[in-house]
C-alpha cells in the first residue's frame, strides 16, 4: 500500500472553485499515476481555514466515484502557509514509485516535485 500526495491552490473561496480545483487535482493524480479506481482504498483532503464553502470530497462523488471512501479535514493553521490550499492523500493498494502532484501556486510547497 502507498500514499500519493498532491495539492492545488483554489482560486477563490466558493463552492464552484473548491470543487473544480479538487476535481482537477484528483483527475491529474489519477492520470499521472495511471491509477485504477478499484485499487483506491481511501482519499483524505485537507483545506486551509479560509476555504469554508465546500467539502472537496464532494468533487469525487460528483465525478461518479461514489464507492471511494473520502474524508475532509482542516489543515493546521501554520503561519506563512499557502492560503486557499487543498491537499490530497490517496491511499492506494499497490507498490510503485508514485508521482506526487503539486499544481499552480502549490508547486512552491514541494520544489523537489
Where are the language model's segments positioned?
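Terminal domain-initiation and capping elements
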Residues: 1-113
Amino acid at each position: 500500500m502507498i500514499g500519493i500526495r498532491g495539492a492545488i491552490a483554489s482560486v477563490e473561496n466558493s463552492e464552484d472553485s473548491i470543487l473544480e480545483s479538487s476535481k482537477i487535482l484528483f483527475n491529474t493524480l489519477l492520470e499521472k499515476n495511471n491509477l485504477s479506481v478499484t485499487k483506491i482504498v481511501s482519499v483524505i483532503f485537507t483545506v486551509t481555514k479560509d476555504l469554508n464553502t465546500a467539502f472537496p470530497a464532494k468533487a469525487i462523488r460528483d465525478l461518479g466515484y461514489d464507492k471511494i471512501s473520502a474524508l475532509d479535514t482542516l489543515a493546521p493553521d501554520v503561519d506563512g502557509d499557502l492560503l486557499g490550499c487543498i491537499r490530497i492523500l490517496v491511499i492506494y493498494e499497490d507498490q510503485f514509485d508514485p508521482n506526487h502532484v503539486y499544481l499552480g501556486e502549490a508547486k512552491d510547497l514541494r520544489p523537489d516535485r
